[in-house]
């Protein structure tokens, strides 16, 4: 068993299909923006919907702070498309149907079988700067991630973050 990704590690690169069916590679999203990568159990569940809508409601704050939000679950790209449309989600959802990326990050399963809910803040260089792991504290995922993104914005203005 792998130890999973830790703060300070390079984020494992991957390519997965988005809700539009287009392949998305993590490495291609880094460089200009911080990536907030959140893993959640499933679309259209109470927790999955609450978390996605919380990220949606704070989406402008994330983009203003120089971050891109990306959600990952085992749902298909088609299911993600319906979920994103239904809840007006402005960010990318990725289909990790085999759980390969979840395993690469070491996202734990709740109760041993429910896919976990973990958020990673990855800086422009691809380094994991923060991990928040909680199945029940949905607001914590959004609030902590935004706080870290804003801190990175002030710490790393030379990397192209807007300041002020």
Predicted regions and their residues:
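Chalcogenol-based redox active-site neighborhoods
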Residues: 1-164
């Amino acid at each position: 068993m792998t130890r999973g990704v830790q703060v300070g590690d390079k984020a494992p690169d991957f390519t997965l299909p988005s809700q539009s069916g287009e392949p998305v590679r993590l490495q291609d999203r880094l460089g200009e923006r911080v990536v907030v990568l959140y893993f959640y159990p499933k679309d259209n569940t109470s927790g999955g919907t609450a978390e996605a809508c919380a990220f949606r409601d704070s989406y402008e704050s994330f983009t203003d702070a120089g971050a891109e939000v990306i959600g990952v679950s085992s749902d298909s790209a088609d299911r993600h498309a319906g979920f994103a449309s239904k809840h007006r989600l402005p960010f990318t959802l990725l289909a990790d149907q085999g759980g390969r990326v979840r395993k690469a990050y070491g996202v734990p399963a709740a109760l041993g079988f429910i896919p976990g809910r973990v958020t990673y803040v990855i800086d422009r260089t691809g380094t994991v700067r923060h991990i928040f792991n909680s199945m029940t504290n949905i607001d914590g995922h959004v609030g902590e991630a935004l706080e870290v993104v804003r801190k990175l914005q002030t710490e790393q203005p030379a990397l192209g973050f807007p300041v002020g």
